């Protein structure tokens, strides 16, 4: 489970994810096939925090990626269905180490 650090933090990462995926969004609207699209970005900056299954839940991990899901209506207007921070590639080692420590 993850969360953004604040409302302002969430809005920043949603806007940045949409901006960095602008061309993909344009292509999605043109294709008119799927009603939703899942976008993601990774960053060197902390995007949020979370806990991991099979670890001590008092251990909060910083995460460095974001997923934003957009939904489109019949008029090609879209809105953010959901957005959440996720563990990035570089976050996985810390989480796996904590899982190993917890299970031993």
Identify the function of each model-found stretch.
Residues 1-104:
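Functional cores of ribonucleases/endoribonucleases
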